[in-house]
């Protein structure tokens, strides 16, 4: 199913920067593993009319949507029927605070490519991204009926020439 999203994104005109469809995994025995593997995929120039924008893809596929202004970007995100997660790359702390406090999604990344929180934060979205009733008893019931938001941020030191990292944080400098 995820490969179908990648195929659809290409067909609809998104710019495919990293193609994970032909990933080959070498097993412990040194031979190619048998199985179904899909590598990271990165699209640029994704637009709201594309299926890869409209649907949640639970696989290693990331789409970049460009907006001319912060209000335009926020309007696109808030109008979307799902509210799982979104990211903003900026050097403007005021814009980051404004964005993270007002955007209507459950997980926000500031200067991180994936707004996936560590285990003690909420993992989940708002709107149609939240399904099920698994948290309806005891202390989880309070959390279930409360809109929670996780904001993950990274602020490189001024003048830091390192390129943006698109991987999970590590202990390496």
Residue ranges of predicted features:
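Conserved C-terminal structural/oligomerization subdomain of aldehyde/semialdehyde dehydrogenase
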Residues: 28-173
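Cytochrome P450 fold signature focused on the C-terminal beta-domain
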Residues: 16-28
